[in-house]
Design a protein with these regions (language model features):
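Peptidyl-prolyl cis-trans isomerase
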Residues: 20-60
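Proteostasis/folding factors centered on peptidyl-prolyl cis-trans isomerases
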Residues: 1-10, 60-93
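N-terminal targeting/tethering segments
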Residues: 16-17, 26-27, 92
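Noncatalytic linker/hinge segments flanking ATPase motor cores
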Residues: 19-21, 49-52, 74-78, 91
Length: 93
C-alpha cells in the first residue's frame, strides 16, 4: 500500500502563500516559516504531518502528495482549509 510523508504550511490567503514560498525559495527554513505562520497545529512541529495513505487528506492535498516531485515545495494549493505550501518528504509505492 502506498504511503507518503509531507510537511505543509497552511495560511488564509493565496498572496500570503506566495510570499512565504518566495521566502523559502530564497533560502528561508521551511520548518521555521511553518512555526511562525501556519494556521495548522502541525506548524508547531515544522509542518510535519507524518505518514499517511491515499485518501486520508482532501483531494487537492492528496493529489500533490501522491503525484508530484519529492523534496520540492509545491503551492499555493487551495483546499477547503485555505492555501497550502506542501513538501513531500517521502513516498512508498
Amino acid at each position: 500500500m502506498s504511503t507518503a510523508q509531507a510537511r505543509h504550511i497552511l495560511v488564509g490567503s493565496e498572496e500570503e502563500c506566495r510570499i512565504l514560498k518566495a521566502r523559502i525559495d530564497a533560502g528561508a527554513d521551511f520548518a521555521e516559516i511553518a512555526k511562525e505562520h501556519s494556521l495548522c497545529p502541525s506548524g508547531a512541529y515544522g509542518g510535519d504531518l507524518g505518514e499517511f495513505s491515499p485518501g486520508q487528506m482532501v483531494k487537492e492535498f492528496n493529489d500533490v502528495c501522491f503525484n508530484e516531485e519529492i523534496g520540492v515545495v509545491h503551492g499555493p494549493v487551495k483546499t477547503t482549509f485555505g492555501y497550502h505550501l506542501i513538501e513531500v518528504t517521502d513516498r512508498t509505492d
